[in-house]
Amino acid sequence: MNYQRLAQLQKLVPQMRQVKRIHFIGIGGVGMSGIAKILLHEGYQISGSDLVQNKVTKHLVALGVSIKFQHIPENVLDANVVVVSSAISIANPEIVAAKKLRIPIITRAEMLAELMRFRYGIAIAGTHGKTTTTAMLASIYLEAGLDPTIVNGGLIKSIGQYARLGYGSYLIAEADESDLSFLHLQPIVTIITNIEADHMENYQGDFNYLKNTFLKFIHKLPFYGKGIMCLDDPVIRDLLPHISRHIITYGFNSKANFRLTNYHQKEAHVSFQLYRQDKPTLRIELNSPGRHNALNAVAAIAVATEEGIADKNILQALFRFKGINRRFDKLGCFSLKKINGKNGVVMLVEDYGHHPTELQATIQSVRIGWPDKRLVMVFQPHRYTRTRDLYEYFVGVLSKVDVLLMLDIYPAGENPIAGIDSKSLCCTIRNTSKLDPIFIHELNKLPVMLAQLLQDNDLVLMQGAGSIGLIASQLAIGKLQTNIRHNPLI
């Protein structure tokens, strides 16, 4: 540990050092746990509560965090400040107790903003791609020896963490637009990857409200700050005339300041040329498939180039980039002989994408990189509201796979909506396309159903943001077969 740098951090805001114990309600979530871990390493006493034990809570307990697995008023008695997840109800007994005791209650984003306030903040926002872009940018800064603090929404495989405390001056963070909480942040540099209708329940169902919120976010930049924005995105192009900050664009668009061309993909390996204004052209090589990941990489390159990071560090970091957990995550290759007695091998991949645009990008990536494979998708829709709002879009995109198995909608805390369910979605796809989806209501039937239909050279894509991640892991460790040969992760 860099004790000298830690001492410097502790002197930045002496008033905050008066805070001894910080309590997190819902500490088991990825976003909450990352910030808790950073504050723990900064020297604060951290406690938390959650209803479920998981890998995250076990890791925090091993680091010395005190976690109670029930929400009771006693948990907050000695806290100086309480940090709450957006998933926590205001009726939570710990919140009620904190209010009675006049203990300050803040959101996760407010605490992240406090961490960013005395660092060089770089915030990555957008409907799609922000987690991967954050990880790519963090990897470049690590390669360059800049030792950044990192707060991400996905596990970065190369460091095995969602978040880390660095002793350099940079804080690289994923900015969450889902509940407008990113408006608390005041970064020096911002990336906006794209803007699309999602989480509309938090925007009163008004897309203009969503657009204007992103406009407010970009104007959180100081006058000397920089906004990095994707010119391929039509909503971003529409917003550009209304922005009064320094903007640098990127994309396949011929007018972009950082322009991709000559894109090639073979399996997971991607290469392309990158033209940069007043800078040498770069040949980029990635092991993250898809045009969407090429765009994510260019967003990171644009920031790194503007910040003066050497090209060799950029190229090396991106080539070595191992990806994000649950983002086109190759879990292994499996012999069919032990699954259904047939000859051949199938490949199992997990992907977190749950918006139809994300599904479309992943399907396109498979078609380009593995053109000879039959694409078998197991999809778990995420949220009733998203399924309702994007129903026709889902129908069109899901119709493009070769075989579709669909699980029940993962509610993510939502109540069911009449007429919005996976069985109806399957019926609509069946009636409007050549595809005959298979609806699976009972999860224990999934391995049997897969075994019946799998063929040599299939690519099985476990798609979704809910419990399907656990299902994919179970399949990979032996529920689908007992003797597994793992390939290196992509």
UniProtKB/Swiss-Prot annotation:
One of its GO terms (biological process) is cell division. One of its GO terms (molecular function) is UDP-N-acetylmuramate-L-alanine ligase activity. Its main location: cytoplasm. One of its GO terms (cellular component) is cytoplasm. The keyword Transmembrane does not apply. Pfam families: Mur_ligase, Mur_ligase_C, Mur_ligase_M. Its EC number is 6.3.2.8. It is found in: Cytoplasm. Transmembrane segments: none annotated. Keywords: ATP-binding, Cell cycle, Cell division, Cell shape, Cell wall biogenesis/degradation, Cytoplasm, Ligase, Nucleotide-binding, Peptidoglycan synthesis. ATP binds at residues 126-132. It is an enzyme of class 6 (ligase). Pathway: Cell wall biogenesis; peptidoglycan biosynthesis. It catalyses: UDP-N-acetyl-alpha-D-muramate + L-alanine + ATP = UDP-N-acetyl-alpha-D-muramoyl-L-alanine + ADP + phosphate + H(+). InterPro entries: Mur-like_cat_sf, Mur_ligase_C, Mur_ligase_C_dom_sf, Mur_ligase_cen, Mur_ligase_N, MurCDEF_pg_biosynth, UDP-N-AcMur_Ala_ligase_MurC. It comes from the Bacteria. The keyword Secreted does not apply. Belongs to the MurCDEF family. Cell wall formation. This is UDP-N-acetylmuramate--L-alanine ligase.
